[in-house]
Swiss-Prot record:
Protein's name in the database: ATP-dependent Clp protease ATP-binding subunit ClpX
A single GO molecular function term of this UniProt record: ATP hydrolysis activity
GO annotation, cellular component aspect: HslUV protease complex
Species: Chlamydia felis (strain Fe/C-56) (Chlamydophila felis)
Keywords associated with the record: ATP-binding, Chaperone, Metal-binding, Nucleotide-binding, Zinc
Gene this chain is encoded by: clpX
């Protein structure tokens, strides 16, 4: 039979040679495989995972979506994120408006304002990712993180942008309705600017193609997501996910963006150094509060992409005091975690104040912000965590400033022999 004359299923594309039965209707055909698939969907209970991404289908299931106020959102973030007061307030308002909009849509109310996608500027380790993670936790919505540098447009080797939606769907246990109200955080977004140099020959060097591909899912589309990920191919099954109400938060360091802003403002009129490369960190942080859409476009982001983020806010570089606070104050502070680990061995772990500041100084020199704190403490305590479980004589360990700065051994306080027995 001529291949051109083969009859195919109008839904999956299988030909009559590949199926057992092909049932004809008015101008359409459906195969036995698709009939079984549809039958299985209809047999499912109404509370099971939806197979369509349409938000209107999910509305009856969640008529009373609870929305925290901006103050409540910030209060929860404060428990985990130190500093960044301006960023936390701005994001709290944006998130409140976003989920208020979703609640109105679920209750079939007319909504004239768009969703509040967020663009976070700031150096590595300033808390951008942690803010996004904390938001998802307190709002009890699915959350996933993607790295923009691994994404490619269609036709290039790399990760398809729609796989980000798949990861969110997986985080929602394949509950489409929940995924459609989740949060996606895309890190390193500045690395796909058109001016970014990239020597790879397997992807779009300019980054514009990746921005265009992301634009579609950020502005709102029905994504056909392969359940198992990977590239799309003919005759593949898809899960349809509507991205219109997914909150997108993107973050990046945007190195040298401050110079672009200073050039636009006129450096001599704002009191900065005559040398554009001689800004202090305080100067850079201040300049980033003045960022405009045109600055991001000059950096290399396309206008359409920037236009989808009506909330643009910067996270400032963390001070020494803030780094020390990160070590000790949050609910899940890393010092608290190590103290608990040693307490399970009946050992008291003590950090002197000077030692905490020494750790903060070391982290600041590493230029990776709060991210360096965990590595410094791991390297510091690794040998102790190896030895202590086998040594019942250890009662307490005192970490001093010279332990950090001069690599001197910590002070070990031992139990009296009679206390060991």
């Amino acid at each position: 039979m001529n291949k051109k004359n083969l009859t195919i299923c109008s839904f999956c594309g299988r030909s009559e040679k590949d199926v057992e039965k092909l049932i004809a209707g008015p101008s359409v055909y459906i195969c036995d495989y698709c009939i079984k698939l549809c039958s299985g969907i209809l047999d499912k209970k109404p509370t099971s995972t939806p197979t369509s991404g349409a938000s209107t289908e999910a509305a009856p299931q969640h008529p009373d979506l609870q929305v925290l106020t901006p103050k409540e959102i910030k209060k929860h973030i404060d428990q985990y994120v130190v500093g960044q007061e301006r960023a936390k307030k701005t994001i709290a308002v944006a998130v409140y408006n976003h989920y208020k909009r979703i609640r109105a849509l679920l209750n079939n109310k007319h909504v004239s304002y768009g969703k509040s996608n967020v663009l976070l500027l700031g150096p590595t380790g300033s808390g951008k990712t942690l803010i996004a993670k904390t938001l998802a936790k307190i709002l009890d919505v699915p959350f996933t993180i993607a790295d923009a540098t691994t994404l490619t447009e269609a036709g290039y080797v790399g990760e398809d942008v729609e796989n980000i939606v798949l990861r969110l769907l997986q985080a929602a246990d394949y509950d489409v309705a929940r995924a459609e109200r989740g949060i996606i955080y895309i890190d390193e977004i500045d690395k796909i600017g058109r001016t970014t140099a990239n020597v790879s020959i397997t992807r779009d060097v300019s980054g514009e193609g990746v921005q265009q591909a992301l634009l579609k899912i950020i502005e709102g589309t029905t994504a056909n997501v392969p359940p198992k990920g990977g590239r799309k191919h003919p005759n593949q099954e898809y899960i349809r996910v509507n991205t219109e109400n997914i909150l997108f938060i993107v973050g990046g360091a945007f190195v040298n963006l401050d110079k672009i802003i200073a050039k636009r403002l006129g450096k001599t009129t704002i009191g900065f150094s005559d040398d554009l490369g001689d800004f202090s960190q305080k100067d850079r942080d201040h300049l980033l509060t003045k960022v405009e859409t045109e600055d991001l476009i000059a950096f290399g982001m396309i206008p359409e992409f920037v236009g989808r983020f009506n909330c643009i806010v910067n996270c400032e570089e963390l001070s020494l005091d803030e780094l020390v606070a990160i070590l000790t104050e949050p609910t899940n502070a890393i010092i608290k975690q190590y103290i608990e680990l040693f307490s399970e061995e009946n050992v008291k772990l003590i950090f002197e104040k000077e030692a905490l500041y020494a750790i903060a100084k070391k982290a600041k020199l590493a230029k990776t912000g709060a991210r360096a704190l965990g590595m410094i403490l791991e390297n510091l305590l690794r040998d102790l965590m190896f030895e202590v479980p086998s040594d019942p004589t250890v009662e307490a360990i005192r970490i001093q400033e010279d332990t950090i700065l001069e690599n001197k051994a910590p002070v070990i306080i031992r139990r009296a022999p009679e206390a060991i027995a």
